[in-house]
């Protein structure tokens, strides 16, 4: 808050006066501004205090709109070293992994794992092969994956025929 010219207690005062809505610890929004469809996802990315979470796994597949995956919870990846005293909301699944900068993208300002990374994470977590195949095929068809990426993703799952197809 100091970096933008506010005193430490200014945000709390604005929240008490109704000028800001407190979403969670350290996360506020302007009440008269629409949160948008991605609002809950940005809240999840901001939940881990001190670092920015990255939406990952099934949540990332859902945001990339490449498969019919329908995650029951929001998956967030934080660095391995990140620790917090706060318990994660029950609507979140927190994964600990040190992602490289090249494995992180953004969708409308929301940090999200790249499609390639999301597919790898989902496959490792046991997401159905039909959803993995659909994600690779649609990702390739939309230009979100190169032929090489698609081939590498599918070779270990017996889905080699998908890598060469462009939907």
Regions found by a protein language model. Give the residues of each.
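Short gly/ser-rich loop at a beta-strand->alpha-helix junction or flexible surface loop bordering the NTP-binding
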Residues: 2-167
């Amino acid at each position: 808050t100091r970096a933008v010219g506010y005193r430490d207690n200014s945000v709390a005062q604005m929240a008490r006066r109704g000028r800001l809505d407190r979403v969670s610890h350290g996360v506020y929004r302007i009440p008269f501004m629409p949160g948008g469809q991605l609002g809950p996802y940005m809240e999840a990315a901001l939940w881990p205090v001190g670092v920015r979470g990255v939406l990952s796994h099934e949540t990332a597949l859902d945001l990339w709109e490449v498969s019919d995956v329908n995650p029951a919870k929001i998956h967030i990846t934080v660095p391995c070293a990140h620790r917090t005293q706060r318990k994660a909301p029950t609507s979140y699944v927190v994964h600990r992994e040190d992602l490289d900068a090249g494995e992180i993208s953004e969708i409308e300002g929301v940090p999200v794992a790249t499609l390639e990374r999301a597919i790898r994470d989902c496959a490792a977590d046991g997401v159905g092969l039909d959803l993995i195949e659909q994600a690779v095929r649609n990702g390739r068809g939309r230009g979100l994956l190169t032929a090489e990426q698609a081939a590498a993703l599918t070779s270990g799952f017996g889905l080699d025929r998908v890598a060469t197809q462009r939907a």
